[in-house]
Amino acid sequence: MKPVMFIAALATLPPAANALDLTGLPAALTEKVTAARQACAEVENGEFALEWGAVTRTDLDGDLQADWVLNESAYACSTAVSLFCSTGGCVSHFLVGDVVGSFRNQGWTVLTFGRNRVLLTRAHGSACGGNSPTPCFVARGWDPDAKVWRSVEARTE
């Protein structure tokens, strides 16, 4: 009798794979999820899932407040495995205030450099004149006055 009760209890639980709660997600990022869901549905009526790790909170601009990051690496479409990512990586959307910066990357981290926060992303090696395994990185800093991400292309002297 106990196994039947256990199975009945499981049947009342909500599905976990698609049940990531997005109620607190800012509108600018909710729009990104909605567009992804629609793009997936357009490919043979695919089913979209937002997997764990899709949303991250971290201080991107050094104001000691947690900003928002939406990682397309945690998007899944049942009918198009590579719809959101490629060998170049996946797009991550970094929300500071009301500004979204979207950057394709193969991974990212935030570092403290002096009094600045630096968004460091790994780029496809072709962005540095090489190929896929070539080490290549982009460093960006948030400019709070202009409300833009700032970076410079590195040049070797």
PLM region descriptions:
Residues 45-54, 101-113:
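Repeat-based blade/solenoid architectures
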Residues 72-76, 96-98, 122-129:
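Short, flexible beta-strand-to-coil junctions
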Residues 60-73, 113-124:
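Acidic/hydrophobic-patterned starts of short beta strands in beta-sheet-rich repeat architectures
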Residues 87-97, 137-143:
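Beta-propeller blade signature
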Residues 14-16:
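N-terminal signal peptide c-region/cleavage motif recognized by signal peptidases
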Residues 3-5, 18-32, 36-44, 108-157:
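Acidic, small-residue rich beta-repeat scaffolds with periodic aromatic anchors
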Residues 45-46, 79-87, 127-132:
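Short consensus segments that form the blades of beta-propeller domains
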Residues 65-66, 76-79, 84-94:
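Mature extracytoplasmic domains of secretory-pathway proteins
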